[in-house]
Curated annotation (Swiss-Prot):
This is Cytosolic Fe-S cluster assembly factor Nubp2 homolog. Keywords: 4Fe-4S, ATP-binding, Cytoplasm, Iron, Iron-sulfur, Metal-binding, Nucleotide-binding. Heterotetramer of 2 Nubp1 and 2 Nubp2 chains. The keyword Iron applies. Pfam families: ParA. It comes from Drosophila persimilis. Its main location: cytoplasm. InterPro entries: Mrp-like_CS, Mrp/NBP35_ATP-bd, NUBP2/Cfd1_eukaryotes, P-loop_NTPase, YlxH/NBP35.
Length: 255
């Protein structure tokens, strides 16, 4: 039930392990920090990371007459979270489902969750272009979707998969809002590229979509995993916070 949701943003990645869920989580927290009511929907069925990243593992969801009720992280209900991880007894339990069952579950997540009034719903997807993504795109035809953000590291292998994501979005009619790159930053001021540099910038220029910023992987940000603390609150002067502010400003301007 997305009738109370004003804006829907999908977060994609061509490969796993590039920081997509971290970007989704911190983007949701940054939007909340900016005064918006936000929902975060984790549909990465085989690798749900959002409950761990927000310290919500072990939370129990329940169903009411109107559908599933998401987990709220605060009494003011400024951040609502839904994930397949809440349905698993153990974080290490695998989800061994065939395509049709995955499709059914994602449709339920997109249509049967009782979201309250939300300014933004961030959808964290699995990596790649699979049945899950096709299901999301089909459901988005029935609900206004603002577009997709693609998360990548700048090495050529990851960028090749990003090109596939871009083609997928174009074929399914999803607007591309921009690319976010992930680097490694061993200290506060000097960013070290362990891959090739400027790959995302050059690709964004080539396909004519915005390059939203480069998020350095700051060890201090990793410490925030397991809590609902935003980088903007805890590390307001960090390079990561500066990039997140820019992304939020870009999204708010578009919506």
């Amino acid at each position: 039930m997305l009738d109370k949701v004003k804006n829907v943003i999908i977060v994609l990645s061509g490969k796993g392990g590039v920081g997509k869920s971290t970007v989704s989580t911190q983007l949701a927290l940054a939007l909340r920090h900016s005064g918006h009511k936000v929902g975060l929907l984790d549909i990465d069925l085989c690798g749900p990371s959002v409950p761990f990243l927000l310290g919500l593992e072990g939370s129990n969801i329940y169903q009411c007459d109107e559908g599933w009720v998401p987990i709220y992280t605060d009494a003011s209900k400024t951040l609502a979270v839904m994930s397949i991880g809440f349905l698993l007894k153990n974080r290490t339990d695998p989800v061994i489902w065939r395509g049709p069952k995955k499709t059914m579950m994602i449709r339920q997540f997109l249509t049967d969750v009782k979201w309250e009034e939300l300014d933004y719903l961030i959808i964290d997807t699995p990596p790649g272009t699979s049945d899950e993504h096709i299901t999301v795109m089909e459901c988005m035809r029935e609900v206004p979707c603002n577009g997709a953000i693609i998360v990548t590291t700048p090495q050529s292998v990851a960028l090749d998969d990003v090109r596939k994501e871009i083609t997928f979005c174009k074929k399914t009619g999803i607007k591309l809002l921009g690319i976010v790159e992930i680097f490694v930053c061993p200290n506060c001021t000097n960013c070290t590229n362990i891959f090739s540099s400027n790959g995302g910038v050059e690709l964004a220029h080539l396909v004519q979509i915005p390059h939203l910023g480069t998020l350095p992987i700051d060890p201090r940000v990793g410490v925030l995993a397991g809590s609902t603390a935003s980088v903007l609150d805890e590390l307001p002067d960090s390079p990561t916070a500066q990039v997140l502010r820019g992304i939020v400003q870009h999204l708010v301007a578009l919506t």
